[in-house]
């Protein structure tokens, strides 16, 4: 660390500690005691300098900060069920929706403080950080869903359906799409959701039955409000419902049958692309398996899909054109050589080969990339460069977002936030960070250019496309057709 940044951090932490004690005099002695502990002062300095959001949580809710320290939570790797268990404990005795929303937001602030503390101090790697944010989102959805289901069932009865001759209670399932489905949420992600339920029917146990679709629509609205709405206590996660069938004009909730019919009859290639990461984040295991099994044939096809190849080529062109049109050079996600291009490379192979190569039916980008090397879909050196770039870019994204809890992937332009970002990522100055960033983005751009090559860009690719068309039209002799299929990973 350079002398300039060291002095900046030292000056900042002295001022921040004084401000904390002034605003929270009842915690002043406690903080002084903690500062005597090994590593605490250094970790506090890194956290408060690297994340003004984390510092504000400590200022405004010192009881949450103290509880984490007393529990030694900053030193602990949480088990998968820890987030749900901690939140469930905090919701005990709550029977009012307003109190639920306050508790959800309080829990979010506390858990994000822990996650950012561990991230900036490199007590957690990228996989743990994204997993923890995703599990926090899952727990919030599950607990809010269960609360509102109980509340609405008390008013309108329990939704049921006739299944194998038996009236059976029905539940609403929540599909987590995108990064939530893949346990890859960043520090300030929105969450893409789709709601569905197994069978049509109506409620029972109330004076006037209600159609299941209406019941679950009301439930969905309550859930979104509890998670998404900005209040005096903040929000939990921004909710995006645009990936559902028919988009913003579609029903908020669909039955399994209606979902299956939509994707079979009207599902588009970009929806296949989106469905790769889909995962049930709330709902019973039995119904979760059922809906995923219904959607799998739409996502992964066991034959060569020529239209998908062309759609992916168009998508690739759109990605590059959008980056140029919007001037996204400083965007580590959407700009050239950014996170989206790495995700596109992985998902291209999944859509084209995933139906035949089960190892590619994986939600997490890093696992897909490793599978591509193992299956000789990409050279090992290319995969290694992409993996290194992915970790670097995602860590950069987190450093940007942790600063003020803002959903941004744009590199800062001013000196102070630049010095904070470089410090968060362990660089002595912005210049060293920028050089490393350029190296990774250059590597990603090079590999992105080689995927689904435009015919005009490569005579070899043009020749291969011509051979595929001849195969499609039945113009190749059987031995030649067989060799073409085998050479390109198809039996």
What is each of the regions a protein language model found here?
Residues 1-491:
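A nucleotide- and high-energy phosphate-metabolite-utilizing enzyme signature
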